[in-house]
Amino acid sequence: MKQKYSKLPNGYLESIDRGIRAVRHFRGGLTEGILSRDEAISRLKTEIETAEAIVIGADAGLSTAAGLTYSGERFLKYFGDFAERFGIRDMYSGGFYPFPDAETRWAWWARHIYYNRYVPAPRPVYEDLRNLVQGKDCFVITTNVDHQFQRAGFDKKRLFYTQGDYGLFQSVNPAIRKTYDNEEWVMQAMEAQGFVRNEKGIFEMPAGGSVSMKIPALLIPKCPDDGSDVTMNLRADDSFVEDEGWYRASAAYANFLRRHEGMHVLFLEIGVGMNTPVFYVLNPIRPKMAKNSRFYPENGYFIKELSRITDSERLRRCA
């Protein structure tokens, strides 16, 4: 796959390289102004209105604002049995838990995938963000793997999910550089555990409140090409499969940046923490400012953190 797409521009690798150089460039010389909430909203609104293009860089904080929380009440609602039996405290750590058998491990993952990939987010933050940039020349690059941008109506051809997708499996056989849609399997595995659909078609706990923590052995997912085991298509190490869709999205992102050099581009970074890979992945933004003055400050504008205005009410105030 890498050889097949070697001639395409790789926005992912370019971004990492530029990000590292940008960190070195700005080290010790970067200051951030402090704006009031109203000032920040007003400034963002102005930049959105005047920008010729917008690049949205999003990390887990955006999905958290949308209600896709991995701990607390939501976790206990769907994983209370796993918490009680294994002492798991949240969905994130549960993904690394050494379950006793494959039937239990895949029961966990069926729930994890379903409630973070195949159901609407509790709050319409993604939809509000889409409405906020409606009609603008926009591209999204994100480390989120929950598919929420697409669910909210963002253009699939202008999305780059750098770290994978909960909706995809990959083979453990490193020779197979493909991914496989898992929706049908997830629905079967949820039914096998005893979850029932409500009036909206969403799986919920049955009236008795008890479900199985295992799936049948025959339902353990296998690679359709060679029958090998599968795993999640999530970037955990160098075994992560960058498939055809990944390479095309990477090229589309790189081309979008090149097409808009010298233009007034708003780089909107939302929910991004300093300890996540997205800090480097999303950083064609900062090196562009360092390397090319046409991007900043005369033409471009970079908003680093919008955690104060990522809920629906405040996003609507920008519209």
Give the residues covered by each predicted segment:
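Conserved catalytic alpha/beta core of Sir2/sirtuin-type deacylases, generalized to analogous enzyme cores
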Residues: M1-A319
